[in-house]
């Protein structure tokens, strides 16, 4: 069992702050403007003259966005774990193992967020506003309700994957033992210790992967069917 302060800080930073705030924000900033930014900067013409179909251009740009955001998430995760466990007595092999699992789960989450916000960017002009509202209402509010509606959120599946692969049980200085994740995420580990009512690990991976592919595919189709107009500068 890990010491409570380290586990609690790990949980607070890696599984509350980063997934609920930073991951959606990173994805929103990078993915929502894949096409809009090109239009506003009047650089989309340079992309459209290339001998590539629009759907393929969108997919290539989305893959580049996935790569960029995943690299950022990996760096953020590593720095977070170094800061948490730098002066602890936890073996670095255990820290590295935990960091690897956390980075893998959060990378899948940010890829899914990018796919969602990329689609939103094609459907709405005010994609940043809609993305913030989605993050606050859906991923912030609905995901924290002990109802089946939370199964429609990205963060729910990341939490289940984390709970099935990482140990959040902590022993406090007074000897009390608690599972910080189960309490905060409203998982009934007393009556359902195996979480039989929740998806299995690979089911969660499959759900998020399918969601990413579907959102990217729909966005690529929309990109193919849409005519993009660029404002030309007025002549004096």
Annotate the PLM regions.
Residues 225-236:
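Short cytosolic juxtamembrane segments of multi-pass membrane proteins
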Residues 1-34, 41, 58-125, 161-164, ...:
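Secretory targeting signals
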Residues 1-10, 123, 128, 132-222:
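Terminal transmembrane helical anchor/hairpin motif
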Residues 42-43, 130:
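Transmembrane-helix signature of polytopic, membrane-embedded enzymes
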Residues 46-53:
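Short helix-to-coil transition segments within interhelical loops
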């Amino acid at each position: 069992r890990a010491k409570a302060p380290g586990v609690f800080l790990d949980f607070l930073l890696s599984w509350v702050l980063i997934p609920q705030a930073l991951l959606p924000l990173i994805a929103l900033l990078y993915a929502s403007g894949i096409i809009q930014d090109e239009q506003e900067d009047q650089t989309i013409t340079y992309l459209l003259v290339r001998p590539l179909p629009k759907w393929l251009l969108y997919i290539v740009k989305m893959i580049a966005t996935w790569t960029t955001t995943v690299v950022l998430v990996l760096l953020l995760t590593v720095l977070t774990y170094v800061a948490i466990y730098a002066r602890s007595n936890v073996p670095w092999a255990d820290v590295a193992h935990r960091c690897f699992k956390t980075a893998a789960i959060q990378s899948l989450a940010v890829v899914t967020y990018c796919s969602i916000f990329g689609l939103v960017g094609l459907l709405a002009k005010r994609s940043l506003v809609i993305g913030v509202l989605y993050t606050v209402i859906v991923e912030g509010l609905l995901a924290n309700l002990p109802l089946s509606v939370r199964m429609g959120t990205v963060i729910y599946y990341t939490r289940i994957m984390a709970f099935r692969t990482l140990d959040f049980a902590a022993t406090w200085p007074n000897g009390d033992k608690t599972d910080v994740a189960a309490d905060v995420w409203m998982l009934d580990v007393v009556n359902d210790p195996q979480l039989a009512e929740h998806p299995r690990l690979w089911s969660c991976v499959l759900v998020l992967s399918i969601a990413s592919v579907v959102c990217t595919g729909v966005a690529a189709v929309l990109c193919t069917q849409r005519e993009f107009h660029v404002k030309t500068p007025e002549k004096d």
